[in-house]
């Protein structure tokens, strides 16, 4: 069953958290859920080059809080925070309420090559550039190993290298325990549009196990990490709507 069910949905409340954190009545719940979906689609479409791996949405009364986990926070923030204002106005336009209070937090992803969504996005970009899929997968595995992940599985489906018959190819390095509930599995999917059709990409990243004492297994740092030692991840918190 662990190989069939969605890894994130299986571990909600254990090692994973909900992407939308709010409560609503049964009447307003569908509208708010669709609103969250529109916000996420708008952000990924407009800021596709910012490397946004996750969008967390929280609601408090009439205030909307959006947290963006990105590999390139400078693209979102812009000069003197101008990008935040553009993003806020875009979200207000998407929800159809220009008076809605929108608070935006931008958090930099600490290890880019250990993030499943960013790895899937990298693979999709390479495949769209007509790079051979085996070479692309090998390069993605090497990047993830340098980032210090404990296990990785990549699956690509479709007309690989322009073949007449679609097929599925996958590779796995290290441990990817899908049946272990305490295992922190980062899972993401992506679609690559090529001249031969679309290719489906799935990425599983095993980052460690959450132990019973709420401490997490240490992940060894690669011998050649991409990030410089001692550099702290950036975080930008929007407080312009407060007061």
Swiss-Prot record:
Residues 39-110 form the KH type-2 domain. Disulfide bonds: none annotated. GO terms for cellular component: cytosolic small ribosomal subunit. Residues 216-243 are annotated as: Disordered. It comes from the Bacteria. Keywords: Ribonucleoprotein, Ribosomal protein, RNA-binding, rRNA-binding. InterPro entries: KH_dom (IPR004087), KH_dom-like_a/b (IPR015946), KH_dom_type_2 (IPR004044), KH_sf_prok-type (IPR009019), Ribosomal_S3_C_sf (IPR036419), Ribosomal_uS3_bac-typ (IPR005704), Ribosomal_uS3_C (IPR001351), Ribosomal_uS3_CS (IPR018280). The keyword Nucleus does not apply. CDD domains: KH-II_30S_S3 (cd02412). One of its GO terms (biological process) is translation. Residues 234-243 have a biased composition (Basic and acidic residues). The keyword Translocase does not apply. Belongs to the universal ribosomal protein uS3 family. Part of the 30S ribosomal subunit. Forms a tight complex with proteins S10 and S14. PANTHER family: 30S/40S RIBOSOMAL PROTEIN S3 (PTHR11760), SMALL RIBOSOMAL SUBUNIT PROTEIN US3C (PTHR11760:SF19). Binds the lower part of the 30S subunit head. Binds mRNA in the 70S ribosome, positioning it for translation. This is Small ribosomal subunit protein uS3. It comes from Synechococcus sp. (strain CC9311). The lineage of its organism: Bacteria, Bacillati, Cyanobacteriota, Cyanophyceae, Synechococcales. The gene is rpsC.
């Amino acid at each position: 069953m662990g190989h069939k069910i969605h890894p994130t949905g299986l571990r909600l409340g254990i090692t994973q958290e909900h992407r939308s954190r709010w409560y609503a009545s049964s009447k307003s719940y569908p509208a708010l859920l669709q609103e969250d979906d529109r916000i996420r689609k708008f952000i990924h479409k407009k800021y596709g080059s910012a490397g946004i791996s996750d969008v967390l949405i929280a609601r408090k009364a009439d205030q909307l809080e959006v947290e963006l986990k990105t590999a390139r926070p400078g693209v979102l923030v812009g000069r003197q925070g101008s990008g935040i204002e553009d993003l806020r106005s875009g979200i207000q336009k998407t929800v159809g309420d220009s008076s809605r209070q929108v608070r935006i937090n931008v958090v930099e992803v600490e290890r880019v090559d250990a993030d499943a969504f960013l790895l899937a996005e990298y693979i999709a970009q390479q495949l769209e550039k007509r790079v051979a899929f085996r070479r692309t997968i090998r390069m993605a595995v090497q990047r993830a190993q340098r980032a210090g992940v404990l296990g990785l599985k990549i699956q690509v489906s479709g007309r690989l290298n322009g073949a007449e018959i679609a097929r599925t190819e996958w590779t796995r390095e290290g441990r990817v325990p899908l049946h272990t509930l305490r295992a922190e599995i980062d899972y993401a999917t992506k679609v690559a549009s090529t001249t031969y059709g679309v290719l489906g990409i799935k990425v599983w990243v095993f980052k460690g196990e959450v132990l019973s004492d709420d401490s997490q297994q240490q992940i060894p740092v690669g011998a050649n990490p991409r990030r410089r030692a001692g550099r702290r991840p950036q975080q930008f918190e929007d407080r312009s709507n407060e007061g």
